[in-house]
């Protein structure tokens, strides 16, 4: 497994691969890797000839400095997971490598996909995501890029951003990986106590119940949202950030539940913010 720390090192290696007509897959991460990330590596291995993983905690996407300071880091463990996952190259840059002149005063947006959800509750977050992704894509020049659908809005944004700017990369969304009890895997889960982990299971239960209500024939999104909210409100430890029932393709509100549907939630348990979602399709009548 190759470890690169500069864009120049990556460029040399990727050029070699592409000269051999190899397809390059890319999984951008912020480290503290878990089985969810490993599943992205497997998807990449199934699609591309070479797998590149970046590990970089991007300061530009944190609207809360304390959240950035507390983000867990385990580089040695991450490298072991990458090696066992048959990753070909790991990009381990420093902040000064990605932003040699500091974080630039530039705003990258896809406005029609940034009117709700995390774009509203975490102002500046996705601008920072799009900034770092544009730089990483420029360095790696991947043919494919893999994103977990747990961060569903991020996946849609990056896909649309690449389409708008004509990045020659296919953005592929991968299904959320969960614990045996249903909790969506996240690096932030490590900051939860055992009691808080039990409480956090209400997030996936609420979303699953919402999905079941829709599949049972309920057409009113307000009714479904209220049912899910009752589940989350049953715990005094859960503080709701948002809970939405939206069109899964446009992130617009729905008046009637049909077509591609997204159920999305963000909550705080203590100081830890967790997100989760479910998508489903209901045929139009």
From Swiss-Prot:
Annotated active site residues, numbered on this chain, are: 37 (proton donor)
| Enzyme Commission number, as recorded | 6.3.2.1
Where primarily located?
cytoplasm
Binding of (R)-pantoate occurs at 61, 154
What is catalysed by this protein?
Answer: (R)-pantoate + beta-alanine + ATP = (R)-pantothenate + AMP + diphosphate + H(+)
Instruction: Give the keywords, sorted.
Output: ATP-binding, Cytoplasm, Ligase, Nucleotide-binding, Pantothenate biosynthesis
Query: Where is the protein found, in the record's own terms?
Result: Cytoplasm
A GO cellular component annotated for this chain's UniProt record is:
cytosol
**Would you say which domain of life the source belongs to?**
Bacteria
What GO biological process term is on the record, naming one? pantothenate biosynthetic process
Report if keyword Ligase is assigned.
yes
- Name the job this protein performs: Catalyzes the condensation of pantoate with beta-alanine in an ATP-dependent reaction via a pantoyl-adenylate intermediate.
What is stated as this protein's family in its record? Belongs to the pantothenate synthetase family.
Q: How does it assemble?
A: Homodimer.
Miscellaneous note of the record: The reaction proceeds by a bi uni uni bi ping pong mechanism.
From the Swiss-Prot or TrEMBL record, give the protein name. Pantothenate synthetase
Give the organism the record lists. Answer: Leptospira borgpetersenii serovar Hardjo-bovis (strain JB197)
The gene coding this protein: panC
């Amino acid at each position: 497994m190759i470890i690169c720390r500069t864009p120049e090192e990556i460029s040399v290696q990727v050029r070699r691969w592409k000269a051999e007509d190899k397809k390059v897959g890319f999984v951008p991460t912020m480290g503290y890797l878990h089985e969810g990330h490993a599943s992205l590596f497997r998807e990449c291995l199934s699609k591309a000839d070479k797998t590149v993983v970046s590990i970089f905690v991007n300061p530009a996407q944190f609207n809360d400095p304390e959240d950035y300071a507390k983000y867990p880091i385990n580089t040695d463990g991450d490298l072991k997971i990458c090696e066992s996952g048959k990753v070909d190259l790991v990009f381990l840059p420093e902040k000064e490598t990605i932003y040699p002149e500091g974080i630039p005063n530039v705003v990258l947006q896809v406005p029609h996909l940034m009117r709700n959800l995390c774009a509203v509750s975490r102002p500046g977050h996705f601008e920072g995501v799009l900034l770092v992704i544009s730089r990483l894509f420029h360095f790696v020049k991947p043919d494919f890029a893999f994103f977990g659908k747990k961060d569903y809005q991020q996946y849609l944004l990056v896909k649309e951003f690449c389409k708008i700017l004509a990045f020659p990369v296919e953005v592929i969304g991968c299904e959320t990986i969960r614990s045996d009890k249903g909790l969506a895997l996240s690096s932030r889960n490590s900051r939860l106590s055992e009691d808080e982990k039990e409480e956090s299971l209400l997030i996936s239960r609420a979303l699953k119940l919402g999905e079941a209500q829709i599949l049972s024939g309920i057409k009113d999104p307000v009714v479904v949202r209220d049912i899910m909210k009752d589940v989350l409100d049953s715990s005094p430890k859960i503080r709701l950030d948002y809970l939405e029932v939206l069109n899964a393709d446009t992130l617009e509100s729905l008046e009637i539940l049909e077509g591609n549907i997204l159920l999305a939630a963000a909550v705080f348990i203590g100081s830890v913010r967790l997100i989760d979602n479910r998508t489903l399709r209901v045929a139009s009548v």
